[in-house]
């Protein structure tokens, strides 16, 4: 899948290092992304979910093998700078064998966990889809590595695993959280002691138009938020950064909504 040349969106925030934020790559063309990263040379690269293009479970072979461009992107990123990856809803079916390949790229996988890096603490909150499907897989272990799950089963009980965040927010240092779903922010994250949160998921609201009521350009629809969502791009409360993403996964075109790489520079 080809992507148009992404725009480079720049935000200046209180942050110890310069960071690139990638989201919603969906196994597309890594070349324009890596070209931008090679030119900009961020100190850290973050991938906040939906690295792959998800599919219904049931095909033969590893899911990650169907997403070779995603693996290529991670290897390219890890060769440029320390790279940290969290899991979005499109990664829900990945098995431990799949995740082993993700780790083999040199990127650090953050699956409801955190690591320390140069005075920072970087965590990754996995999509609730991952937990739902892992539970389902255990209950249907005799049906292969990727037992098919009814969509109604997948979408119920959509609560991420939050317990580890209590320890995360008590860590010393600048706390950066990768969380694919921006709709988790008002529900679970706003009041936590987290310095910066990186999200994506909404593809910028698909169609973006100027709202005279709000005095800004806003998206039309986002999963998890519905029509005229509030959280589709930009910086919110000085701590939630949302990327419009790198790809499109639907036949509905993006209108007034270019793909983007977000660069965070420190004040």
Model-derived features with residue positions:
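Acidic, histidine-bearing metal-coordination/catalytic regions of metal-dependent phosphoesterases
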Residues: 1-20, 25-26
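Beta-strand-turn-beta hairpins that frame and shape the catalytic cleft
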Residues: 11-20, 107, 114-127, 170-174, ...
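Acidic/histidine-rich helix-loop elements
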Residues: 19-31, 51-68, 93, 130-151, ...
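Active-site neighborhood of phospho(di)ester-bond hydrolases with catalytic His/Asp-centered motifs
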Residues: 21-23, 44-50, 82-89, 110-112, ...
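Core catalytic region of metal-dependent phosphoesterases/phosphodiesterases
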Residues: 31-118
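Short, charged, surface-exposed secondary-structure boundary motifs
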Residues: 55-56, 118-121, 133, 206-213, ...
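Conserved beta-sheet core of the metallophosphoesterase superfamily
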Residues: 84, 182-262
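Binuclear metal-dependent hydrolase catalytic cores centered on His/Asp/Glu-rich metal-binding motifs
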Residues: 104-105, 118-175, 179, 185, ...
